[in-house]
Amino acid sequence: GYFADPGVKDVPELWNLGFPILTFTEDERILLEKLPQTGGRLDRQTVTEQLLYEIQDPANYFTPDVIADFSQLSVEELSDGWVEVKGAAGKKRTGTLKVSVGYQDGYIGEGQISYGGRNCVARAKLAAEVIQKRLVLLNKHYSETRTDLIGVNSLYGAEQEKVFPAPQLSEVRLRVAVRAEKKEDAEVIGREIEALYVNGPAGGGGVRSSVESVLSIASVLIPEEDVHPTVCWERGE
């Protein structure tokens, strides 16, 4: 999973993945296999990519038990579909534990509308301009505002249009989202998007809107001696 790229990195039977099974040997090797007659791909390339996933410094990967060092790892394909990993090392743990604290952080209001046919991108951009100026007229100020043309610039921003000029699209979807402290302020964006049916460019449809509370996360380090784990066993009936 999260590896396939058709024609570049093909994965057979992605709908029937066989997840890896790890065996740890006494001589500090790891042997990986997957169940026979399952899809997916287990080889040097997939194992290496997974090892490096979301690791900033392979020589210093912090865990509660050890600082892992993957910088000298070797990954080798063996016979019968096995993959061998060896060379991992460890350093003394930091003495701290990571704690992720969730807290309420306002609301996100979102509205979407589609435009299709000839000149649809220009009409979607005009609709975005209408929304922006309507918010000014209503004296609405938000801590964050985001406008996307899904299929044109939603992933890489407006700068991508300079590098990859937009093709002649037959459809595009406008998404406008805001962050607000109050729920009622976040709800405004949905009403304004819906008003584009009659007060916006021609041919809009498929309006959807939502308001969600935001749960943000702050990650902090605390001394490990402040945490006292306990284990409770319960017998089921």
Listing of model-derived features with the role each one plays in the protein:
Residues G1-K92, S100-Y103, I108, Q112:
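A conserved active-site cap/scaffold subdomain adjacent to cofactor or substrate pockets
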Residues K86-E237:
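C-terminal non-catalytic interaction/assembly regions of soluble proteins
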